[in-house]
A protein has these predicted regions:
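A short, aliphatic-rich alpha-helical micro-motif
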Residues: 47-48, 114, 136
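A short glycine-rich, Lys/Arg-flanked "PGG" loop and its adjoining helix->strand segment in the class I
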Residues: 133-148
């Protein structure tokens, strides 16, 4: 990892470790973002019963819980903020669920199996990457042959739409 990328990741990690509680539960499934269509409208995931799912930038675990409630078979989450993962672990435990949680930047090599997941997804997280090409290649390697990557991120026009909602 380049020095500049490491600096950016550390700055972002510091922010999320400091302010994780302020963002608890924000921008999580079924919502894809502010004034976006929801999973209940789009049905991008369909039936996740028994499926293996990996969330990139899992934050406080609310989207993981969303899938647990829909009988996902196996849940994994990655986040570079230890505080976010502590919140996720506690939130999932309080609701009777669990997930394999990994504290790491999404750009890093991790102990995540290749050709394993039915879905990899990121709700408002992928835009934090310092290496989009490398991150997308990693995500592709985690997916089964017919696996699906779903993500949401904002566009500058969203600010105009959000103010009119």
């Amino acid at each position: 990892m380049k020095r500049e990328e490491a600096f950016i990741i550390n700055q972002n990690r510091h922010y999320w470790d400091t302010y994780a509680d302020l963002w608890f539960g924000a921008t999580a499934l079924p919502k894809y973002g502010v004034c976006f269509a929801t999973e209940n409208e789009l049905h991008l995931f369909g039936d996740v019963s028994g499926k293996k799912l990996l969330e990139i930038c899992c934050g406080s675990g609310h989207s993981l819980k969303y899938h647990a409630e829909r009988n996902a078979g196996e849940l994994w989450g990655v986040d570079f903020s230890q505080k976010q993962l502590e919140n996720a672990k506690q939130y999932l435990r309080e609701n009777g669920y669990s997930a394999k949680l990994i504290c790491s930047p999404m750009e890093a090599d991790m102990d995540i199996p290749n050709d394993y997941f039915d879905f990899v997804y990121s709700i408002y997280g992928i835009g934090w990457t310092t290496d989009l090409d490398g991150t997308l290649k990693k995500i592709a390697s985690y997916l089964k042959k017919d696996g699906v990557f779903i993500f949401s991120w904002h566009h500058t026009l969203n600010y105009c739409v959000a103010w009119s909602c």
